[in-house]
A protein has these predicted regions:
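Intrinsically disordered, low-complexity segments enriched in Ser/Pro/Gly/Ala and basic residues
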Residues: 2, 17, 30-31, 48
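Short amphipathic alpha-helix segments
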Residues: 9-28
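Short acidic DE-rich linear segments
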Residues: 84-87
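Exposed, low-complexity/repetitive linear segments and helix-based recognition motifs
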Residues: 7, 26, 72-74
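Short glycine-/aliphatic-rich beta-strand segments at the starts of folded cytosolic domains
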Residues: 1-7
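Acidic, low-complexity, intrinsically disordered interaction modules
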Residues: 31-80
């Protein structure tokens, strides 16, 4: 089954948050920005602050976000940064 294409950063952010939720990654803060690379291409940058210390969870989240990048973004590249915050 083909997944719908993602055409804006807010929808992309929702997808990333749902992946974090699926793997029980505690999201403390999330920010995003869209960078226009040229006339046709954009970059979506999503920064997530978390108190998670489990590298296995990080790997799973990055892998799933990579799927979004490869399969579902027709005109943008996605960069997800997971930043561990000590509370």
């Amino acid at each position: 089954m083909a997944s719908a294409k993602i055409r804006n950063i807010e929808k992309c952010k929702e997808e990333v948050l749902s992946i974090c939720s699926e793997y029980q990654l505690n999201v403390l803060d999330i920010s995003s920005k869209e960078i226009q690379l040229d006339d046709l291409h954009k970059q979506y940058v999503i920064d997530i602050s978390t108190d998670c210390e489990d590298d296995d969870i990080y790997d799973k989240v990055y892998t799933r976000c990579g799927f979004i990048n490869e399969e579902r973004l027709p005109d943008a590249d996605l960069t997800v940064n997971l930043n561990e915050v000590n509370i």
